[in-house]
């Protein structure tokens, strides 16, 4: 299963609340980690955004 197409197309839409453009997430979930910013993609346990932006705070 490949929930993100960022690595292939540069854009992706993971679910209804995760939209990516040029591998930047407007909001990210665990299933969309591959296109989160560097601060999120480093999280081994996945990334979860509690707000409307995807930044280092979404790493848990």
Swiss-Prot record:
List of residues binding a divalent metal cation 3: 14, 18, 23, 28
Annotated positions binding a divalent metal cation 6: 36, 40, 43, 59
Binding site for a divalent metal cation 4: 32-33, 43, 47
Record-listed a divalent metal cation 2 binding positions: 6, 12, 14, 25
Ligand binding (a divalent metal cation 5): 33, 35-36, 49
Family assignment from sequence similarity: Belongs to the metallothionein superfamily. Type 1 family.
Function: Metallothioneins have a high content of cysteine residues that bind various heavy metals.
Protein name: Metallothionein
């Amino acid at each position: 299963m490949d929930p993100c197409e960022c690595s292939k197309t540069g854009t992706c839409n993971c679910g209804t609340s995760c939209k990516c453009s040029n591998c930047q997430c407007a909001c990210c979930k665990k299933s969309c980690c591959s296109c989160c910013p560097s601060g999120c993609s480093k999280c081994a346990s996945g990334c979860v955004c509690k707000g409307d932006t995807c930044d280092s705070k979404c790493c848990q």
